[in-house]
Amino acid sequence: MRTSILAACLAIAPRWLPAQAVTSQTARMETGFLDRTVSVNGTMYRYEVYVPSAYATSTDRWPVILFLHGAGERGSNGLLQTEVGLASAIRRDPSRYPAIVVMPQVPTDSVWIGAPADAAWTALDQTTREFRTDPDRVYLTGLSMGGNGTWNLAYQHPERFAAIAPICAFITPFPQLRGSRAIVPRDSGDAFTAMARRLGKLPTWIFHGEVDPVVPVAESRRAAEALKAAAGDVRYTEFLGGGHNVWDETYASKQFQEWLFAQRRSRR
């Protein structure tokens, strides 16, 4: 009787185990723009993760880019942040960004400070657990309000990133933006100097339009000057005649892409 039972179990097992393996393999091979959520203090935040198609046939660990959107992409549908900036560049030419890209979304009337910043960290951490990622190649970039978020997250944990790229960003509070407040402690003295001290040798490439009518170009100029004065690893590009939307040119730049993916946390 025991022999019969064992034989029956062995006969069933091969039919069941491959099905489990196929299910797990399918989950691991999910690519494209994927919907995800995180919860912070009881509030749900939506985010998108872009996974290149080549991920499905690779066993490598992939670089990660955390992208922070601007004020115009705030909401709760989890999709607006994929229509402007880095996601647009990826759709135009996916080969330029061979990376897993994390794109969180903040609610209407929110900024990348406090709980929304925590949600960005949580989305990043959740992504690095879900996919094969390289902790030595984690990058941060954002535009406009997201550029402010880039400065904020980099100030909080500069050691987490291999490089950052704030675009048409601001460091000091922006009165026209509801909820905007200081991201550098007020007792730290000059905000730009304090930011530069905090970032140290973190590779930073700053972009801004010369005649930006929304965010004063002085914000990026002062940040670049402070980083240079502190012997930081900084590049600054100012688009002559450029307005607020210089992110399309930035993300389309082959030079920027090559620089970004060449950076490593371990080299600092």
Model-derived regions, located:
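Bacterial N-terminal signal peptides
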Residues: 4-15
